[in-house]
């Protein structure tokens, strides 16, 4: 019992203390409805819901939408790489933002359509770094952050495969 020596409890004791429900980071399940009611009076609520509705109406842009038309006219590798980086970032940045909006809109409304669309988009984005159409800093940390936020927020809605993918 010396304060200088830490003796961790046995694993069985630690496991006993674990909750049997998924712990939430953004919104606790028990206070979610109250959170939604309080949020409805905020202008940000309307902004996120309106933006999410707009995102839902537009198909996700993908790697095939990256404009590479001018690539062949560039005379050196450095200019080509800068061009690919700039053009790929246009698509990537927009879709990262769209994914974030859908996650927030789901948390604000419990509309499962937002969660399903966000899940589909985020899983798709997670493979973009493997493409030759993407160059430069892909912001993988942003995608990981977005995926973990989606995992936490949609946990009860996700299939086992979706949980593994996120």
Feature map (PLM): residue ranges:
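Aromatic-lined, polymer-binding surfaces characteristic
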Residues: 48-49, 57, 63-71, 81-166
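Mature catalytic domains of secreted/periplasmic carbohydrate-active enzymes
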Residues: 29, 34, 66-68, 74
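Mature N-terminal, pre-catalytic/accessory segment of carbohydrate-active enzymes
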Residues: 1-49
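Short, flexible helical or helix-coil boundary motifs
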Residues: 6, 42-46, 55-63, 75-78
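Short, mixed-charge, low-aromatic patches
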Residues: 5-10, 72-80, 102
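Amphipathic alpha-helical interaction segments
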Residues: 34, 40, 55-56, 146
């Amino acid at each position: 019992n010396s304060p200088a020596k830490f003796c961790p409890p046995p694993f069985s004791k630690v496991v006993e203390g674990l909750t049997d429900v998924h712990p939430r980071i953004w919104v606790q399940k028990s206070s979610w409805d109250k959170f939604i009611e309080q949020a409805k009076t905020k202008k940000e609520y309307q902004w996120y819901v309106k933006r999410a509705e707009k995102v839902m109406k537009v198909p996700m842009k993908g790697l095939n939408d990256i404009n590479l038309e001018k690539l062949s006219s560039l005379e050196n590798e450095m200019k080509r790489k800068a061009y690919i980086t700039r053009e790929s970032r246009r698509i990537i940045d927009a879709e990262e933002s769209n994914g974030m909006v859908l996650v927030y809109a789901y948390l604000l409304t419990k509309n499962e359509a937002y969660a399903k669309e966000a899940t589909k988009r985020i899983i798709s984005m997670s493979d973009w770094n493997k493409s030759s159409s993407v160059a430069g800093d892909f912001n993988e940390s942003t995608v990981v952050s977005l995926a973990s936020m989606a995992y936490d927020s949609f946990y009860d809605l996700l299939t086992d495969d979706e949980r593994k993918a996120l």
